[in-house]
Regions:
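Conserved hydrophobic/aromatic beta-strand scaffold that supports enzyme active sites
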Residues: 38-40, 123, 226
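ATP-binding glycine-rich phosphate-binding loop
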Residues: 22-44
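ATP-binding pocket architecture of kinase catalytic cores
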Residues: 48-71, 77-163
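Residue-level detector of alpha-helical secondary structure
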Residues: 13-14, 37-40, 71-78
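ATP-dependent phospho-/nucleotidyl transfer catalytic cores
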Residues: 2-5, 28-32, 55-56, 62-66, ...
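Hydrophobic HxD+1 residue recognition
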Residues: 231
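Juxta-kinase regulatory segment immediately upstream of eukaryotic protein kinase catalytic domains
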Residues: 1-28
Length: 238
């Protein structure tokens, strides 16, 4: 991802690249995320205000941004179809990806914009009357968060996970993670192994557990399923 500043001109071009309803009348930074650059876009359509999320995806971390967007489109379309079939609220029950303003764009190009400096942009409808919390304020909030992640798994229980791209290759490959841990432990490059002896002993005593899920998946003993894998509070809208 480029380190060049996101100028007003770049923002205007990015806004024009998506099929936002109405005329853009305000652009503001959104949130305190440390991975992507996010903005709230406000538009005016005959006196009606609408809001959208416009975001620059960090391609230093997500090296296959098209694959990431294909995943999001496939997953959200599956959830949306399920909500509609069950009579649920498909507008608020899942993310809605905003399409490109280029009506000739096809495939994943219809859901993203790459600017003059190589930044990868995407956009969503803003889900009004929701909050994103950084800290847990009550047991009820904790229960709602648990329900949300559990419901996400339920909604995707019949989804073909084999069609998804791996967003960050081997990020959750515990077998490779454990091998990297043992390699670092053997080298002890900054001389801190002795100060963590108790924690290291705990991990090495459970080495056989490190590859259990990966091995069972490879052997067909576990079914391949979609998982969220970043189930923290700030990734939920309440």
């Amino acid at each position: 991802m480029t380190d060049l500043p996101i100028t007003d001109a770049v923002l205007r071009e990015a806004c024009a690249a998506f099929a936002f309803r109405g005329t853009v009348c305000d652009v503001k930074p959104c949130g305190n995320g440390h991975i992507n650059h996010t903005f709230i876009i406000t538009t005016d359509e005959n006196g009606m205000r609408r809001r959208y999320i416009l975001q620059v995806l960090n391609t230093d971390i997500f090296r296959d941004p098209d694959g990431v967007m294909e995943n999001i489109v496939r997953v959200t379309e599956h959830i949306r179809a399920g909500l509609l079939a069950a009579g649920g609220d498909a507008e608020r029950g899942c993310l809605h990806v905003v399409r490109s303003s280029d009506s000739t764009a096809t495939g994943i190009a219809a859901y993203r914009y790459v600017d003059r400096d190589g930044r990868f942009w995407r956009a969503y409808d803003f889900v009004e009357h929701t909050v994103c919390r950084l800290t847990m304020d009550s047991p009820d909030t904790f229960r709602m968060v648990g329900w949300a992640f559990g419901n996400f798994q339920h909604q995707l229980s019949d989804f073909d996970a084999s069609c998804l791209h791996e967003s960050i290759p081997d990020f959750h490959n515990t077998k490779k993670r454990y091998a990297a841990f043992l390699d670092t432990l053997a080298r002890d490059p900054v001389g801190r192994a002795a100060s963590a002896a108790e924690e290291i002993a705990f991990l090495t005593a459970r080495q056989e557990r490190g590859s259990r899920i990966v091995d069972d998946l490879a052997a067909g003993r576990l079914p391949l399923r979609v998982t969220h894998n970043d189930t923290k509070l700030s990734n939920i809208l309440l």
